Every structure is written in C-alpha cells, then in structure tokens.
C-alpha cells in the first residue's frame, strides 16, 4: 500500500481510470492499527486495484473534502470521482471490508 503524502499526489492518484482504494488512517488510531493486522490478505486478494494510504492528520483538507469523519475509512476513486465510501463504523473487521469490496466490485 503506497502512502500518499501530498494533496497533489492524492489528486493525481484518484484521476486514474482504474479504481483505486484509499485507506484514511492516523498513527494514534487503535482501530487503524487493528486493521493493519488483518488487511494484507484482503489487499492481496484485490491486487488488481491500486491501494493507497493517507494520514488524515497530515492531509486534513483531503479528508474533509472527501467527508472522512472517522478512521479507518476506505474510499474508492475512479476518474477523479469517489465511487464508494466505507465509513469507520463499518470498517472494524475483515468481514465488513470484504463485504464492502465484494459489493462494490461485484466479486
């Protein structure tokens, strides 16, 4: 998962025609650390998509502009548009994340 560190880089990444999955997180967030322990097999399973991470504290404007109110949150972008948003309340388990991705990508 590539870390995005600037607004410019974020804006460039989301313009792709291929869907990109962006995880918003923060270093102090216990749920984000928990997700880090189980997300790798899911990233591997959905490896035909590019995965990115954004520290919401470092890119607050990007998080705010994309209505990221809680973390961790997964957002899917394609052609510069947000296609789907898994809010933090529903991103607590591998099953919730898998269900979101299956529904979004019809896999």
Name every feature range the model reports, one short phrase each:
Residues 11-41:
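Local sequence-structure signature of Cys/Sec-based thiol-disulfide redox active-site neighborhoods
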Residues 30, 58, 92:
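Short alpha-helical
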């Amino acid at each position: 998962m590539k870390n995005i560190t600037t607004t410019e880089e974020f804006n460039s990444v989301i313009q792709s025609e291929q869907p990109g999955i962006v995880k918003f997180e923060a270093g102090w967030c216990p749920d984000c650390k928990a997700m880090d322990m189980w997300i790798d097999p899911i990233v591997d399973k959905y490896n035909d998509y590019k995965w990115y991470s954004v520290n919401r504290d470092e890119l607050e404007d990007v998080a705010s502009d994309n209505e990221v109110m809680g973390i961790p949150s997964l957002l899917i972008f394609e052609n510069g548009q947000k296609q789907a948003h898994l809010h933090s309340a529903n991103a607590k388990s591998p099953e919730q994340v898998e269900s979101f991705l299956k529904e979004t990508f019809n896999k």
